[in-house]
Amino acid sequence: MSVHSPNPGLILQSKRFNGLRNILEREGPFCKDGFAASSENLEFLQTKCQVLIIGAGGLGCELLKDLALMGFGNLHVIDMDTIELSNLNRQFLFRRTDIGASKAECAARFINARVPTCRVTPHFKKIQDFDESFYQQFHLVVCGLDSIVARRWINGMLLSMLRYEEDGTIDTSSIVPMIDGGTEGFKGNARVILPGFTACIECTLDLFPPQVNYPLCTIANTPRLPEHCIEYVKIIQWEKQNPFGVPLDGDDPQHIGWIYERALERSNEFNITGVTYRLVQGVVKHIIPAVASTNAAIAAACALEVFKLATSCYDSMANYLNFNDLDGIYTYTYEAEKSENCLACSNTPQPLPIEDPNTTTLEDVIKLLCDSPRFQLKSPALTTVMKDGKRRTLYMSGVKSIEEATRKNLTQSLGELGLHDGQQLTVTDATSPSAMTLQLKYQSNEVEMV
């Protein structure tokens, strides 16, 4: 009588989640109040819980791997980028043969082939390509982004999905928690955001450093830094000479070499030192230093918070983790507080202080909205309701015909435009899927209305 040996693959698969069963099927002294130990908890993770991962780069690859191996059976991943050679040292779900292909699709294909208990659905699109109904299907959203604009946009989307009871309280069933991770070199952070209850991205916007932009007049006429020389060659000389007949490719050594040589010539002309091949690569590609071990640590922290929120087995982090392993290991967790004046989650018009409406032009207001650490907008469009009840578009750059029609308003003062103290402006911008309301607050009482 022959005896068939058991399938080692099936045995391994049945034992894979024994560690999770120890957590989810029995209670302990650190369990969250109200946690019910049951086999249904693991079943929920494997069959019902849907998690959206935004970004399939260094953090995203780690998050996909972690969540797939933690029992999550239904993952979606969004990424609009394609794979570059420079990604391969840390984005381990990709191979050299994947260069030029979609990050989301390659990452999903790798996980689906390697982890049979998990199904990953890829979306090779921008997050802005999806509407509210798409995001409502998920129990949690976890972000591994390198863009502040994208963070602010998804933050605004999750806030716009909140529903309110008749007494003004939030319907908790409409909350989709967001777990956000970020890294730069040996530093990183992870945070838990419960929209409407905890501090959101906008509440702590001043924690993000403003993006460095070099004025065109400076890089063209009075360069002082090696970065100015590189930007000049990249923006002006490349466009004018088009040396290779194709768009600039930051991964092409010929392109980088050409920019390096021209930037070196310009730096010598203005007696500027410090132009190196590596610096040219960093400026051209906007490289943020990335260390694989930092990505792994932050992704693990994020994945743990996803697990705790999905199963309610332990209290989630409250709510911001700092991580630094530059000199040893340093971590610190604190509770970021909601801002009463938050542009996104306060639900009240926010004051926009104006020193003198007779000298402050609309262009000054737009510059304030773009440069202020509080706002950090990209290309705001402004509309308002005038005294006669008619809605008026003050300025909108996104539509050519409207931009041309409203361009003359830029040089007019707020008084000349007929905007009074306390008037509300509706502002839309690429940083948010929904409009924000600002209320003009004049410091000067005398306004000359034209």
UniProtKB/Swiss-Prot annotation:
Belongs to the ubiquitin-activating E1 family. UBA3 subfamily. Heterodimer of Uba3 and APP-BP1. Interacts with Nedd8 and UbcE2M. The active site is at 217 (glycyl thioester intermediate). The keyword Nucleotide-binding applies. The lineage of its organism: Eukaryota, Metazoa, Ecdysozoa, Arthropoda, Hexapoda. InterPro entries: E2-binding, ThiF/MoeB/HesA, ThiF_NAD_FAD-bd, Ub_act_enz_dom_a_sf, Uba3_N, Ubiquitin-activating_enz, UBQ-activ_enz_E1_Cys_AS. It is an enzyme of class 6 (ligase). Catalytic subunit of the dimeric Uba3-APP-BP1 E1 enzyme. E1 activates Nedd8 by first adenylating its C-terminal glycine residue with ATP, thereafter linking this residue to the side chain of the catalytic cysteine, yielding a Nedd8-Uba3 thioester and free AMP. E1 finally transfers Nedd8 to the catalytic cysteine of UbcE2M. Required for Cul1 and Cul3 neddylation. Negatively regulates full-length ci stability and hedgehog signaling. It catalyses: ATP + [NEDD8 protein] + [E1 NEDD8-activating enzyme]-L-cysteine = AMP + diphosphate + [E1 NEDD8-activating enzyme]-S-[NEDD8 protein]-yl-L-cysteine. Keywords: ATP-binding, Ligase, Nucleotide-binding, Ubl conjugation pathway. One of its GO terms (molecular function) is ATP binding. CDD domains: Uba3_RUB. This is Nedd8-activating enzyme E1 catalytic subunit. Expressed in the wing disk. GO terms for biological process: negative regulation of smoothened signaling pathway; positive regulation of peptidoglycan recognition protein signaling pathway; protein neddylation. SMART domains: E2_bind. It holds the Pfam family ThiF. ATP binds at residues 58-82. Its EC number is 6.2.1.64. SUPFAM superfamilies: Activating enzymes of the ubiquitin-like proteins. One of its GO terms (cellular component) is nucleus. Pathway: Protein modification; protein neddylation.
